[in-house]
Amino acid sequence: MPDTLIVLIGPTGVGKTELSLSIAEHFRTSIVSADSRQLYADLKIGTAAPTPEQLARVPHYFVGTLQLTDYYSAAQYEADVLAQLEILYQNHDTVILTGGSMMYIDAICKGIDDIPTVDNETRQLMLRRYEQEGLDTLCAELRLLDPEYYKIVDLKNPKRVIHALEICYMTGKTYTSFRTRTHKERPFRIIKIGLTRDREELYDRINRRVDIMMQDGLLEEARQVYPFRHLNSLNTVGYKEMFKYLDGEWTLEFAIGKIKQNSRIYSRKQMTWFKRDKDIVWFHPDQQTEIMQYIHSVNH
């Protein structure tokens, strides 16, 4: 029987963490995180990282392994996770991958295009330009250099825009030319399970989760990482709103409201992305019995 990767997918706040723990305990296996922010050791509360108690229940990988200043790409994540899976499959025939970072999930399930590594000189040049000229200027430049990618990239995400320009400048080719979208075959079976809730139910959970984060000390966590606010790792819902409060631009009540609003918006983006994937079979998180039956029906 081939090794199996159970991929547990869903929007922020849907209930992936608790269900992934239950499934992992059932199979006596480990969990690999596919959350690009839970990688950072200093971002525990705002990323809803697994608690010490949850980490004690099931071994987790790719949680709290990076410093805020570390540069880490989806391509590096792909390489590191595939290497870790090879080790885990020596003792387990099933491993859980769970998270809401769409690009990280695709990196493991489908593979990342072989895009050249950006040299440090080009990276520093583009970061300086971003700081001095702003995102709008770089977006306009991307429109000229790679109009095809300009049409599909999230123009509000500086990391994506900057990276595309880095490739354009370093290679003299468009970023689009490297995006072959070739699906890489994996040496393990992939079972994709999506978790979903009614919108009103999900939004209520998101709102309550933000309130719990505030009670758990999100403001203090944001204050501790405030000196690093310019880093891409902190261009994240929960932290960027707290920074506005710490700057004196927003009241605390308004900042909390914006965290809730932006989290809801992000959940919609996640669902739009996930709905494109026809391999995902969808369940409500309370359907644990049906989920386990489905896994066993396809994993034999």
Swiss-Prot record:
It catalyses: adenosine(37) in tRNA + dimethylallyl diphosphate = N(6)-dimethylallyladenosine(37) in tRNA + diphosphate. Substrate binds at residues 12-17. Its cofactor is Mg(2+). Residues 35-38 are annotated as: Interaction with substrate tRNA. Keywords: ATP-binding, Magnesium, Nucleotide-binding, Transferase, tRNA processing. It comes from the Bacteria. PANTHER family: TRNA DIMETHYLALLYLTRANSFERASE. Belongs to the IPP transferase family. Catalyzes the transfer of a dimethylallyl group onto the adenine at position 37 in tRNAs that read codons beginning with uridine, leading to the formation of N6-(dimethylallyl)adenosine (i(6)A). This is tRNA dimethylallyltransferase 1. The gene is miaA1.
